[in-house]
Every structure is written in C-alpha cells, then in structure tokens.
Amino acid sequence: RNGRLFLGGALLGVLVFVLVFGVSTLDVTNDAFCRGGYIEKDIQQHYAGWLFYRQSSAGWPLCIARGINYPDGLSVAYTDSIPLVAALLKPVANLVGGTFQYMGWFTLVCFALQGGFGALLAGLFLPGCAAPLAADLLFVTSPVLFERVFRHTSLGAQFFVLAALYFYFAARRKGQYASRGLFVLNVLAVGIHPYFLPMTYAITLALLLEYALHNRQLAGPGLYLAANFSGTALLGWTLGLLYGSASSGGQALYGYFCMNLNALWNPVGVNGVLYSRVLPAQNQVYGNYDAFAYLGLGVLIALPIAVVLLRRQLGGMLRRHWALACCCAVLTVFAISNVITANGATLATLPLPASLIKLFSIFRSSGRLFWPIYYLLMLLTLVGLARLKGRWLLAGAALLAVVQVWDVSPGMVQRSAAMQQAMQTDAFPTEMESDFWQAAQQYTAVVSMDEIQDDALHLALFAADNGMTTNDPFAARYDETALATQREALLAELAAGTVREDTLYLFAEEGAFLQAVEPVKDNAWCGRVTSTDGTCSWYVIAPGLQGQNFDALCTPYDENYPLRLADYTDALWNRGVLDETKQTVCFADSPFVRRKLEHASVLCADGKEYTIKTIDDHDAGWLMVTLDI
C-alpha cells in the first residue's frame, strides 16, 4: 500500500507541475526564465552562482565558485544554487557542454516528492488509497509551495517537511527513535537549503525526547542525535558551507521578515497575487510577505470542524506528542519574532540583546520556520476527516480537495502565466544596454569598489558569461570584512596611479569615483555609464579603453563632466537639498568638485543660473553650497 500511495502521490505532483508550468522548464538548454527572472530576480542569483561554479576548477571542498567573492571564492549555497544538485550535475553539464540549467527538473522532482510523501503522510490517518490521494491535493497545491517554486527555487523542496512528519509519526507508531528516514533528511537538507535544518531537526528532536522520556533511555537517542549532527556537518563541510567566513548579507535583521498574525487567512502573495477566490487581501508590514502562510479556504473551513470533532481526543494527542507540540510552539514564536505584527500594525517590539538578534539573524527570514506547523494544520483536518466512514470519507476528502483547489487556483493560474511570460520576455530585463559593455568583455575581472552595484544580478551574469571574476557582493552571504580590506587595497593602488590592465573598476557612488579617478584618468576610459531610462548608473574606470567613444549612455570624465548633487537624504536633507531653506545644496567632496567650484560664481541647472553665496567645507567629506534662490 505504501508503494502505491507514494507512486500515486508522486504522479499527482508531476501532473500538477505539468498543468501549471508545462514542460518548457525541463529543457536544460532553455535558460530564458533563469536569466530574465521569474516573479522576482532571485533565480538570476541562483543561476549566476551555478554558472560561476560550473566554470570553476575542481577543488576541495566542493561547490566553491572561485569567481565569486574573488579571490577567496564562495560556496554556491550562498547563491541558493542548490549545492548538492550543483555538485552532482557539474560533471554531467561539462560533459554535455553548452547551456545547462537544472531548475526545471529539480522543481519537478520536488513536486513528485511533495506528492509522494504527502500521500504517505495522509495514508497514516486515512484508510485505503483513494482518500489519501484525494487529500494529497492539499499538499501538492499548497499556496506556500507555489509561492516558492522557481522564485526561491531551493525552497520548493518542502517535501522535507512532509517527509520528516511522515517518518516521525511512523516511528512513533513503531515505538522507535532511530529513524533512518529522518537521519537522511537531516543530512541532505544542508545540501538543499539550510532553512530546512531547524524544521527537520525540530521534528527529529521531538521524536527523540518523547522516546527518551517515555522509555527512560537517554544514551541511544543522544548518540543518534550526535551522529546525525556529525553527518550534517560533514556534508555541509564537503559542500563548502563552512568555507571561509560568509557572515554578512543585507541590512535586514531578525524581526524584519516576521510572520504576521493574519498569515493563515491572508491570501496575498508576492506582487499582490491573491490565492483566494473568496477571502480579501489583508494588510502587511515590513517583510511579512516572506512569511506567507495562507492555508486555503478548504482547510480554513475544515480545520475548526476537525477541532470540534476531535475535541475529546486533542488533549490525548497533545500529551502523546508533547515534545512535537513544544517544538512547534518554539518554531511559531520564532516565526512571529520579537516584532509582533497584525494586519498593518506593529503591536509590539520586544527588546532583545544585540547578541541574540545577531544569532537569530542566521535565520532572519523567520516566518519560513512556521512551515512544519502549517502542514500539521493541514494534517489535522485529515485526522478530523478520518471520523467519516466508507463512502462518506472519500466524499469528504474529495469535497475538501475540490474546495481547496478551487479557492487557491487564481494564484496557480497567475504563476502559470508568469512562467509563460518569462519564457518569452525578460521579467527583469538587463539595464546594461550601453555599447560600453561590449567593449568591457575583454576584462578578466570586475571589481566593485563600493557597496553593491546597480543591476547586480545581470552584472553577475555578465561576468560569468565572459569568464570574469567579481567581488560584487550579490550573494546572500559574503565576507564583509575581507571585502572592505580588498577595496582599501585597490583604492590605494588607484591613489598611487596604478591600474590593473585586466580589471574593470566599478563604483556605485559618484563621490567615491571622483575621489579615486584623478590619478589614473589618463590610463583608462573613465566616466559614467547609465541605463536607457537612467535608473541605473555605474561609474567606471576601464583601463586600455581611453580615447574610445561610446554611445549616448556614456558620459566621459573630462573637463565637461557635469556636477551632480549628492544623493543624500536624512532628517534635514532631501536628495542633496537642505529641506529647511531649499537654498543650500551639497556635493560629495572631491578634487574634481573643488576644482569646479574654485572660481565659480554661479551654478547652472536646467538652463537656469543661480548665484553662489557661500561654500562651506567644515563637514568632512561634503561641500555645502548656498545659492541665491
């Protein structure tokens, strides 16, 4: 029976995948949706990491992309490129040659395993095969699943949660603790995405605690857990997760991506997509969107009914599975975080020590850790459904599935349309449209001299496609200290008038560019490159290209290079203009700006001249000019 359930569930998952996404993503030579983006830009990051790793020389540990975070390299785990899959498929891809993307096949396997383990889990509580397979539709059409697949590709492996729950309940029924299934899941999870680790280990810990206290045996469960930790650490080390010091990534800390208290009945997905035909959109704040956990109308209706039907059994369930309940409570509290939000309001922000905030920020997208509880709530509806007998059970399971799929189908339809569109046109087209970038293909290294560059993911793809290395911090984690040290050394070289002929220097901030460019302006093409719409800018030092003329998107650094206000905003300033008087503007201090202002009597902007009254440089790094306006 288990074999039939798993096979039937897997086929159901494959069917749902094909109906929603078709088969075009299964063409490994079709990477259009990887390059152009799908729903968000993240898949561009995943694919860029794979491209860098594929062209990296063999070494140990595995999965180190030598061209990222150059010169140290970085594990593709931190570009969410599914390191275990990348390691297995790199030899295959290099043998086949040409374009090779695995995002489609990986996601298909995720759907198959979601269906397979979902059917097994349902089969633990529902008799026969028909009712569990009907109930399995809840798992293979899960809104949380569809919110992640192809968008955050590795997080589509939510079968890890279903499989962990299945192995937990199966082991409990057998009175065992040494579940081989849980052991394997805990090891493999680190090779797919680290966020699955606290989920699968929480379920494992619950099993071990319940067994240890019930049987008064600590040694066996303790050794099992130690061996499991060792296996996980070994695979993590093998795949490069412990390589270097990848500790920084983004400004958002624990509490920003918290779960809103309305998450279970809020059908709003990313980009405002509604996963419900009935329920309206609810407000959210901060990064609540990443904690999306809409249950679906079928489950929301069936869940309170199940609670009523099981009211006499719930106490016994909680006593039998006390450790699982405790682990779920901890995961829920962690998901909600210290920033408690409801609809569009922040109810409270509980103070936590900075050390705890830093520790918890390892899993800063805390709302994801609610997934085990999310799927347990679905499972609880099936336990309540099991109170029905015979044909009523099958009818109830079918009705639940029909209502659920009918309700959440708008979200699936939109995701289907988005994939079809992504195959035809770029959802996020490149901003690197200038002919400068064709000339820049000659370099072997792209160095980011400050911050993260505009259109960073297309820049990463550009570097990977042309066999370049880059230090631009586009990955989810990187070594912030090492990057700062490297940038200081490069700036010192430029200050000494030295450029590396094989290196393209990029600045995100004009002020930093103007500070660095003077000593090397005769040895490189220097200037500003923009996108067609002007939303993206790169300030470049391109050795060997001096004297060349590029298109209108390029402004060379020469005597005609224009002054620009500093793009600075705080409580007093608004994009370089002092709010209080609207008469004082600021510029980032540099030799170029001082030279321009030295004997100037007026500033000209948009064809109008404004008399300069005073120039103030008392604030280090800034030149403040008061105009007669």
Residue ranges and their predicted role:
Residues 77-82, 101-111, 138-166, 191-195, ...:
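Membrane-interface micro-motifs in multi-pass membrane enzymes
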Residues 1-31, 223-229, 313-328:
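Start-transfer (signal-anchor) and selected internal transmembrane alpha helices
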Residues 22-26, 133-135, 141-151, 235-245, ...:
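Membrane-interface helix-loop junctions at the exits of transmembrane helices
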Residues 108, 112-124, 131-172, 178-211, ...:
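Membrane-embedded helix bundles of polyisoprenyl
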Residues 198-229, 306-316:
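Perimembrane helix-loop-helix junctions
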Residues 226-230, 329, 379, 385-413:
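Signature aromatic-anchored transmembrane alpha helix within multi-pass, membrane-resident enzymes
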Residues 40-41, 235-307:
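Periplasmic/ER-lumenal interhelical loops and adjacent helix-loop junctions
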Residues 17-113, 142-143, 152, 267-271:
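Membrane-interface coil-to-helix junctions
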